[in-house]
């Protein structure tokens, strides 16, 4: 069975429609119990596309790091975040869309067409968009965005682990692994935990119920 790889067909179709500044957008960090949600917007240029781009989840960490460096060297890139406070206030979907909108706004070239991973398009964007389900595995620009966003967020979680050791964020990136959940029970919550997420909320409620 042939394994599908991302290609340039979606960008080519947009160029054929007359668009000139075409970018891919993806986010990472919707599922973790801690840390921000991070989005990247990437404008690739034909003839300067790094080899081996793919969905960041399919790549080992060292390869992601190397590709992220290549992308930053040859593409226009913007990375943005939505904070834990925004996630808890808005909900994770709206916070993800906010991070995407911020990433798009941070590009040096105002895009006129955005290829967005998923099936929903953030509201209020001023340019044409196309949502592509599993776009990080189908579209080169989105694959590049997924890699940049993943590397950027992983680095944030490594930094946060130095401030709050014991939760394993360097390896679990804030996801609800068994060790992370056990650390929550043993060490309690940090300011970087998402109170609106059920496992965290349950622990917070338990702590409140036993307080004097």
UniProtKB/Swiss-Prot annotation:
Key words, A-Z: Cytoplasm, Endonuclease, Hydrolase, Manganese, Metal-binding, Nuclease
Cofactor(s) the record lists: Mn(2+); Mg(2+)
Gene Ontology cellular component list: cytoplasm; ribonuclease H2 complex
Keyword field contains Thylakoid: no
RNase H type-2 domain ranges (all copies): 20-209
Xref: CDD domains: RNase_HII_bacteria_HII_like (cd07182)
Enzyme Commission numbers on file: 3.1.26.4
MF terms in GO: manganese ion binding; RNA binding; RNA-DNA hybrid ribonuclease activity
PROSITE patterns: RNASE_H_2
Cofactor note (record): Manganese or magnesium. Binds 1 divalent metal ion per monomer in the absence of substrate. May bind a second metal ion after substrate binding.
Main location: cytoplasm
Compartmental location: Cytoplasm
Protein residues bound to a divalent metal cation: 26-27, 117
Reaction(s) catalysed (UniProt annotation): Endonucleolytic cleavage to 5'-phosphomonoester
A GO biological-process term: mismatch repair
Job of this protein: Endonuclease that specifically degrades the RNA of RNA-DNA hybrids.
Family: Belongs to the RNase HII family.
Name the UniProt record assigns to this protein: Ribonuclease HII
Species annotation: Cereibacter sphaeroides (strain ATCC 17025 / ATH 2.4.3) (Rhodobacter sphaeroides)
Name of the encoding gene: rnhB
């Amino acid at each position: 069975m042939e394994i599908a790889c991302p290609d340039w067909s979606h960008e080519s179709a947009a160029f054929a429609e007359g668009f000139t500044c075409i970018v891919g957008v993806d986010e990472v960090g919707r599922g973790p119990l801690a840390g921000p949600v991070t989005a990247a917007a990437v404008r690739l240029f034909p003839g300067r596309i790094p080899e081996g781009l793919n969905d960041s989840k399919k790549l080992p960490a060292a390869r992601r790091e190397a590709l992220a460096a290549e992308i930053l060297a040859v593409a226009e890139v913007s990375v943005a975040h939505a904070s834990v406070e925004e996630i808890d206030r808005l909900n994770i979907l709206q916070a993800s869309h906010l991070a995407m909108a911020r990433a798009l706004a941070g590009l040096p070239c105002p895009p006129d067409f955005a290829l967005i991973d998923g099936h929903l398009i953030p509201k209020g964007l001023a340019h044409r968009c196309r949502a592509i389900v599993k776009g990080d595995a189908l579209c080169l620009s989105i694959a590049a965005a997924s890699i940049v966003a993943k590397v950027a967020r992983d680095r944030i979680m490594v930094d946060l682990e130095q401030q709050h050791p014991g939760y394993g964020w360097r390896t679990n990136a804030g996801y609800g692994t068994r060790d992370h959940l056990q650390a929550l029970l043993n060490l309690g919550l940090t300011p970087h935990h998402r109170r609106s997420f059920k496992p965290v909320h349950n622990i917070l409620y338990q702590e409140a119920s036993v307080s004097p």
